[in-house]
Amino acid sequence: GSSLLDIYYGFNLNFPYQVVSAKVNNRSEGLNFKVYNNKDIEFLDVRDSSGMRTYVRSLCFVLFKAVSELFPEGKLFVEHPVSKGYFCNLRIGRPITLEDVTRIKQRMQEIIAENISYHRIECHTAEAVRVFSERGMNDKVRLLETSGSLYTYYYTLRLYGCSVNAG
């Protein structure tokens, strides 16, 4: 099979904005998704609502990674949409300063510049519960424990060394 990204480059497609995901037979998939047979494929950039959601989720992922590196004991909560952004609550045991925000922004830019790949991990739900429990992500643990699903998938940045997970 070929990844959606390979197909995109193979057809030399040109979008005015970076492609962030695709619909395969009308189902949203990441660009690492492998296609094995003939499929209807629609590549998406940020002009599409699904593409914009993918882009925003990836930025939240980068934010979580930056915060976890700069404030290992900190807790970040992405709570709800506000205007054209999201309300976030960062708890690091003291008031957040402008310098903290600047450091987070700088680290996010560095992470983006590293061009780290997102990897989809599929495993037994019990394994995912263990992974999220070790990282103190108790809200995800509770959700998975009551999901009734035998298998779960999650995404990670980097398979080796430091990884950040999101459900």
Model-derived features with residue positions:
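Non-catalytic interaction/regulatory segments
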Residues: 82, 91-167
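Ubiquitin-like/PB1-type beta-grasp interaction modules and other compact soluble beta-rich domains
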Residues: 1-60, 64-83, 103-110
